[in-house]
Amino acid sequence: MSEKFTLSLEPRSVLGKKVKRLRRSGILPATVYGKGIEPIAVQIDARSFQAIYRQAGRTSLIELHIAGHPPLAAFIHALQRHPVTRDIIHADFRAVDLRQEVEVAVPLHIEGKSPLVESGEAVLNQVLSTIEIRALPTAIPAHITVDISALDSFDKSIHARDLMLPPGVTLVTPGEELVVGLAHTRAAEGEEEEAAAETPAEPELVRERRESKEEEEE
């Protein structure tokens, strides 16, 4: 289970284009929504949010305390970023019922060493960086481990169905989805091309003589 965090939010009365003034003063506008509750406009100190986001990411439960509302269990669901600076300019919190399963995207962490990658013959080709799972909010893992130590030949790969999931967690991503595989390095491809080039070609004169002999026998 992921670590639980607590965050205090203030109700926000500034809406629309006026939120630019909040951002200039170091305040991040946000919205809390979820099944069975009306969306709540809130605000938080931008630095405090950044600190929580670095630790919690999008898979750890956060207990939200908002004046005038009961505590809410939520995830950081979506972020809006400035198109140039990439600073976070708005956050969405998704409140959840701890008794009901939810579907979320969980990051994949690569562990282990592939013998072919270590020898320089191959490079790792990671196709998916997250997978979709379904679980109770309290059972959602911070990440799913992908062990690549068994990738010792180019015909081996890891698909979503091969991942080891914790108890109570169900895979939502299609099982046949490729997670990670191996690709030849340029150096290895170059060696194969050199080997092919070194194979002596049959002299033209020998081929002509062989073809003439076959015609005579016919």
Curated annotation (Swiss-Prot):
Query: NCBIfam families of this UniProt entry?
Result: bL25_bact_ctc
Q: Name one GO molecular function term.
A: structural constituent of ribosome
Fill in the subunit field for this protein. Part of the 50S ribosomal subunit; part of the 5S rRNA/L5/L18/L25 subcomplex. Contacts the 5S rRNA. Binds to the 5S rRNA independently of L5 and L18.
GO CC entries: cytosolic large ribosomal subunit
Tell me the GO BP annotations in alphabetical order.
translation
Bias (Basic and acidic residues): 204-218
Q: Which family does it belong to?
A: Belongs to the bacterial ribosomal protein bL25 family. CTC subfamily.
* Pfam families the record matches: Ribosomal_L25p (PF01386), Ribosomal_TL5_C (PF14693)
Which positions form S-S bridges? none
Where does the record place the region Disordered?
185-218
Q: Which InterPro entries match?
A: Rbsml_bL25/Gln-tRNA_synth_N, Ribosomal_bL25/Gln-tRNA_synth, Ribosomal_bL25_b-dom, Ribosomal_bL25_C, Ribosomal_bL25_long, Ribosomal_L25_dom, Ribosomal_uL5_bac-type
What's the name of the protein?
A: Large ribosomal subunit protein bL25
- Write out the function statement from the record: This is one of the proteins that binds to the 5S RNA in the ribosome where it forms part of the central protuberance.
**Which keywords label this protein?**
Ribonucleoprotein, Ribosomal protein, RNA-binding, rRNA-binding
